[in-house]
Amino acid sequence: MTASKARIVFMGTPDFAVASLDALIGEGYNVVGVVTIPDKSIGKHQSIPQFSPIKQYALSHEIPLLQPKKLKDPDFLKSLKAWNTDLQVVVSFRLLPEVVWNMPSLGTFNLHASLLPQYRGAAPINWAIINGEKETGVTTFFLDYEIDTGKIIAQECIPIKETDNAGTIHDELMYLGAKLVVKTTNDILSGTVKLISQDETNLGKQKLKIAPKIFREVCKIDWNKTTREIHNFIRGLSPYPGAWTELTCVKGMTFPFKIFETEKADCHDYSLPVGTIVSDKKVYIDVRTKDGFIRLRNVQLAGKKRMPVTDFLKGNAYLLSLHF
């Protein structure tokens, strides 16, 4: 089946998904419809509709659009079936029921931002960096009954550099994933796909790691961990949602304090308790960890903008107490 004849439906929501949809359109694939989430309401009175990035793209390219609240809604299923789809492509969308993923004649495949079976779940990029992985990647696989467990179609990997954070890896995988989506689509249509089962028992010495959704309480920094662990934790949550701690002022008040960038610091007094702040109040802020000190480079005080530590110290040095 040729690219121009195959009827493809794309399902997705954020910017990460737009790159894949744009790649399919750019390669001449026949995307007959797009499915995304319902509009959100923003503004003082929740009166301003906020479109998902995928909806914005679909509207600008005049692609038919569906925005179901429930994926088993009879009206939605009727409209989806009317598109007479050959293949569905899913990137950063919701969990699909069988009645949806089993509808196309050629099936439904998903792009996942990890090297499956590792890091199944909602936040694979974050957890790979938090856990100190040296590489990650993208996987395309056919959907089945369990989350992120279907047969693998293709994978591509990239190194995680010491200077990377969740934002830089997100962008790299977004474009790498778009290329893999195009390749996977081509292989499916040409009948050249060779499927690989996800074998959790063939990981060697590696443990199976998961990537659950990240909530605010998970993002709090534990200063009792090593410098390396804290450094990976912070960059794994940067720029979003951001690792945080509580800054204790001289008056005893506490404020949420986000940290986006760090590096290993020179040694100070090892007798200092974990969480103690060491600063010249002009250039640097170092914090005692389990095995040394970590230097903060980019921070954000609650209610303020994100900024380099040198800028923060110009107006807020008086806030620093003895510890976080």
Curated annotation (Swiss-Prot):
SUPFAM superfamilies: FMT C-terminal domain-like, Formyltransferase. Keywords: Protein biosynthesis, Transferase. (6S)-5,6,7,8-tetrahydrofolate binds at residues 114-117. It comes from the Bacteria. The keyword Protein biosynthesis applies. The keyword Acetylation does not apply. It catalyses: L-methionyl-tRNA(fMet) + (6R)-10-formyltetrahydrofolate = N-formyl-L-methionyl-tRNA(fMet) + (6S)-5,6,7,8-tetrahydrofolate + H(+). It is an enzyme of class 2 (transferase). GO terms for cellular component: cytosol. InterPro entries: Fmt, Formyl_trans_C, Formyl_transf_N, Formyl_transf_N_sf, Formyl_transferase-like_C_sf, Met-tRNA-FMT_C, Met-tRNA-FMT_N. One of its GO terms (molecular function) is methionyl-tRNA formyltransferase activity. Its EC number is 2.1.2.9. Attaches a formyl group to the free amino group of methionyl-tRNA(fMet). The formyl group appears to play a dual role in the initiator identity of N-formylmethionyl-tRNA by promoting its recognition by IF2 and preventing the misappropriation of this tRNA by the elongation apparatus. Belongs to the Fmt family. NCBIfam families: fmt. This is Methionyl-tRNA formyltransferase. It comes from Azobacteroides pseudotrichonymphae genomovar. CFP2.
